[in-house]
């Protein structure tokens, strides 16, 4: 898929995210919009996983540790054909499997997540299993920067480096905001890249909302033999909509009818700009 095709996907994915959150009257808007470009590139360019290969023991694995941004994951899985997109209309309804965090009841989801700080530990176990079983699959996991205050993330990091898990790719959605404010105000994380390097990762940084930059970075994995890979993806919370970008309140805010209409108009303009550049 070309860069422009991926850019088109991101616009459509953002529309879907906003529609399902608006319809459900619940969801995590800001974090889903910040990470959707990452998921787009993973599922449409990087990973060997599809509805046809999901039972294949050699498939790549994806674990969304920042489970609260599940709307982004649901959007991509529906587009890939794991389930009909119409199923998303049931999100957050009584009896629906489409809840506010990922569960294995949904086709295409590898692991239940939601309690922050656990996804990396699970991913390390999967990557170690691949090494022990001599299987070629890779394990990708997406963490929010806010969950890095969980000690389990650093325990898992030490383990990943100890076992030289160069088949593990950790992506940090570094949007610099969490539910109560800026990460550097809540619990300062910087110098984050240096910390991960000290824990034994091969670290690379990129613009996590730039499709071309993401493609280039993922294409270089593994970065260094014998080291787990870490991509520090610098993103914007609420990316793609002028009035949601870098606004703490949009962590869990649901768009009103008027806000949804305005957002759709902005995304239509973004789509038109892509066509002009084609």
Stretches with model-predicted labels:
Residues 74-75, 103, 152-154, 180-184, ...:
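Short acidic, glycine/serine/threonine-rich loops at helix termini
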Residues 63, 169, 205, 230-232:
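Structured core elements
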Residues 69, 80, 175, 210-211, ...:
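Short, glycine-/Ser/Thr-/acidic-enriched flexible segments
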Residues 10-26, 173-175:
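N-terminal capping segment at the start of a domain
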Residues 1-13:
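N-terminal hydrophobic or amphipathic helices/low-complexity stretches enriched
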Residues 17-20, 32-162:
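Cofactor-binding active-site loop characterized by glycine-rich and histidine/acidic residues
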Residues 211-278:
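Glycine/aspartate-rich loop-and-adjacent alpha/beta segment that forms the canonical ThDP
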Residues 108, 112-115, 120-223:
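Thiamine diphosphate
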